[in-house]
Amino acid sequence: MRFSILTLFPEMFAPLQASILGRGQKSGRLDLNLVQIRDFATDRHQNVDDTPFGGGPGMVLKPDILSHALRATLQGETAHVVYMSPQGSRFDQATAQRLAGYGHVVLLCGRYEGVDERFIDAHVDEELSVGDFVLTGGELPAMMVVDAVSRMVPGVLGDLESAQADSFQTGLLDHPHYTRPAHWVVDGDHYGAPEVLLSGNHGAIAEWRRRQALLRTLIRRPDLLGKAPLSRVEKRLIEALAVDLDALENKH
């Protein structure tokens, strides 16, 4: 899968050469193409922005320069063009899975006051936001998208089961994880791993993990439960857990 990133700060993407994504690029499963927007400026000062029509603070990225950068990147081929924007739809795991189905995704990183709307109308397939907050540019959100989508590309993760068991893949938050030592003491306090995980009973372990995922989601992200594929037994379990939590809160 190929990612092309249109940005004024390509040096910010160096971390994508490390760890799993770096190995994915070396193996040829991922291709990361960084495009410096300023290379397509037409004046000697390499200006890529201008003041907004109608007045107001800040600068706006110019549509003609962005269009030249995009066309040079595509070279006549097609791609799914995404603009990272606070006005975009919320990026989530389902979106990551969908984007992984494209052979080539172009990510435009905005700066300053944003991008001329005419470029969006002419070239952008969708706008995505990573949350209800404002950053100095679209580079960090673009890195998040590349990371999340790359995990869905076959062969990038060494263990496909790891991606399938991630939070949100099943519609729920992930269950707690434990490793050695089984018994840990810190500052005089004793912390033990759950006995069921040490039992070797795979059925009991799977049941415990599912129950913990349900409980964690109920406590931290109850909004997800309405979308998760749950059995009748799990729905009744959630109702019982909710009653127990309400009773516990009322005690305090």
UniProtKB/Swiss-Prot annotation:
SUPFAM superfamilies: alpha/beta knot. GO terms for biological process: tRNA N1-guanine methylation. Signal peptide: none annotated. It is an enzyme of class 2 (transferase). S-adenosyl-L-methionine binds at G110, V130, G131, D132, F133, V134, L135. GO terms for cellular component: cytosol. Its main location: cytoplasm. It catalyses: guanosine(37) in tRNA + S-adenosyl-L-methionine = N(1)-methylguanosine(37) in tRNA + S-adenosyl-L-homocysteine + H(+). Keywords: Cytoplasm, Methyltransferase, S-adenosyl-L-methionine, Transferase, tRNA processing. The keyword DNA-binding does not apply. GO terms for molecular function: tRNA (guanine(37)-N1)-methyltransferase activity. It holds the Pfam family tRNA_m1G_MT. Belongs to the RNA methyltransferase TrmD family. PANTHER family: TRNA (GUANINE-N(1)-)-METHYLTRANSFERASE. This is tRNA (guanine-N(1)-)-methyltransferase. It comes from Magnetococcus marinus (strain ATCC BAA-1437 / JCM 17883 / MC-1). The gene is trmD.
